[in-house]
Amino acid sequence: RVIMKYKLLVLDVDGTLLNDAKEISKRTLAALLKVQQMGVRIVLASGRPTYGLMPLAKSLELGNYGGFILSYNGCQIINAQNGEILFERRINPEMLPYLEKKARKNGFALFTYHDDTIITDSPENEHIQNEARLNNLRIIEETEFSAAVDFAPCKCMLVSDNEEALIGLEDHWKRRLNGALDVFRSEPYFLEVVPCAIDKANSLGALLEELDVKREEVIAIGDGVCDVTMIQLAGLGVAMGHSQDSVKICADYVTASNEEDGVAIAVEKAIIAEVRAAEIPLDQLNAQARHALMGNLGIQYTYAAEDRVEATMPVDHRTRQPFGILHGGASLALAETVAGLGSMILCQPDEIVVGMQVS
């Protein structure tokens, strides 16, 4: 049994897990499935809504391996296996009329998320439409926003192409709303409003406590300013190669960019390559094969592990031709025996090995 140094792998999504085409590369997918098979659990940590992360969680098979979704920049954590909410913080609905008033005064669009929908007063806004498309959400128009939102949202978003105006409101709210709500810009055109003291690291800390996992047993990978706190929290904090210098300086290690399989490279180096091949006891293997073809030919395993398989075969009346040359059939039997065991060693519990020929 392999003792894993790391138990939790926390991944930002956009700009980290996904390439610029918003896809998980084949190499990254293979690496992430591999580490889950090795016992490492994955957390998707994103500003996206929970619904928007579900397809990615399915692609990574988080439900099969006990992974988690940390959504809305930390406002909610759910167990991908059973949908149980493990952590949640929401905005007090009494704050919504104030947010709506400020948005209208500044000419900003306003929206929030609810299940598989976006509720907004500006359905034609290009950025809101892109957000809906990215997360596969329906847009519901509500001209009286605060009256229509009759629930406590995880977060609200103000939208404008006037970045200077957004910065001005952000600075004002950081003073005015201190202790009530937190605000930050996730994009030049987005100003996010979330419950106080919510970020990826604080929510991740709650998950670590729930799972009884130490910080030293966590790897966190991200590319943005919103990822800095979780990168600093983790035992191994990794910044993507295209990150700003302010992010890279906070990391223990800088990997390649999201266009160059940066997540796969980091995971292969930090987790997969660190697992040493463990020898498999040979006595049982050789005993089981005594009455099979390999036993009849005198083949004996001398070493078996994930890195290689070795076996010996005597040159005698069973395996040789005249003048001591090995019989082709015996050589093939030796090759098939070694390759077959190697395939079974590498096979995961949910995989099936089919017949093969090796020459």
Give residue ranges: language-model regions.
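Non-catalytic pre-domain segments flanking phosphatase-related domains
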Residues: 1-13, 30-33, 37
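Mg2+-dependent phosphoryl-transfer enzymes with acidic/Ser/Thr/Gly-rich catalytic loops
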Residues: 4-8, 25, 192-276
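Asp-based phosphoryl-transfer active-site loop
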Residues: 5-22, 99, 231
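Active-site phosphate-binding/coordination module
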Residues: 26-127
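Residue-level signal for inorganic ion chemistry
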Residues: 35, 46, 73, 156, ...
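Short active-site oxyanion
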Residues: 39-43, 65-67, 155, 216-217, ...
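Conserved acidic, metal-coordinating active-site core of Asp-based
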Residues: 102, 106-221, 225, 230-233
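Terminal targeting signals and extreme-terminal segments of soluble enzymes
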Residues: 273-359
